[in-house]
Amino acid sequence: MGLRHILRIDNPDEKKILTTRCHPVRMPNPSLKQLVADMFETMHAANGVGLAAPQIGVTQRLAVIAIPPMMEERPDGTKVEVAPEQTFVLINPEIVKASDQEDVGLEGCLSLPGWYGEVPRAAWVTVEYTDLNGRRQRIRRATGLLARALQHEIDHLDGVLFTERIRDLSTLKSYSEEEAPATTG
């Protein structure tokens, strides 16, 4: 199928789907590989870091994340990759442990393009999920952008939008495409 339409918070019919708690994915599921491929393609086309299934109208507990490679600039100005891209297919994910310490950071969403706000999240999380091969996996004490993306995407699966996590709505700002930070799903 390829690119999918990303539902938007500002469309009342689409917001209804985005705020619905998703159903668990039943395994095995032969159509899952194509859906996951479509999700990655859609997420990359929208310059996102993560995408949850409800954002494309599928109310199942499925999300994809692609943390960009870490680059370092050399003294001569060239950039070199110091850590590769990290990709995850998260089927029926759940946060099993979370830090009591908060990390407040700028966050956006593909369902509200161009808008970002300061969102408090746990500084680290441990997440259990099923991978595309049907095996249970665990991401232990994820931090930084990965921790933020995991929490953001799992919120989508629970019908929670990032705007509901913002404590001070005055931090919700519109940015042009050029100045926008990386966007989670």
UniProtKB/Swiss-Prot annotation:
Its EC number is 3.5.1.88. One of its GO terms (biological process) is translation. Fe cation binds at C109, H152, H156. Transmembrane segments: none annotated. GO terms for molecular function: metal ion binding; peptide deformylase activity. It comes from the Bacteria. SUPFAM superfamilies: Peptide deformylase. Its cofactor is Fe(2+). InterPro entries: Peptide_deformylase, Peptide_deformylase_sf. It catalyses: N-terminal N-formyl-L-methionyl-[peptide] + H2O = N-terminal L-methionyl-[peptide] + formate. Binds 1 Fe(2+) ion. The active site is at E153. The keyword rRNA-binding does not apply. Keywords: Hydrolase, Iron, Metal-binding, Protein biosynthesis. The keyword Acyltransferase does not apply. Removes the formyl group from the N-terminal Met of newly synthesized proteins. Requires at least a dipeptide for an efficient rate of reaction. N-terminal L-methionine is a prerequisite for activity but the enzyme has broad specificity at other positions. Belongs to the polypeptide deformylase family. HAMAP family: Pep_deformylase. This is Peptide deformylase. It comes from Roseiflexus castenholzii (strain DSM 13941 / HLO8).
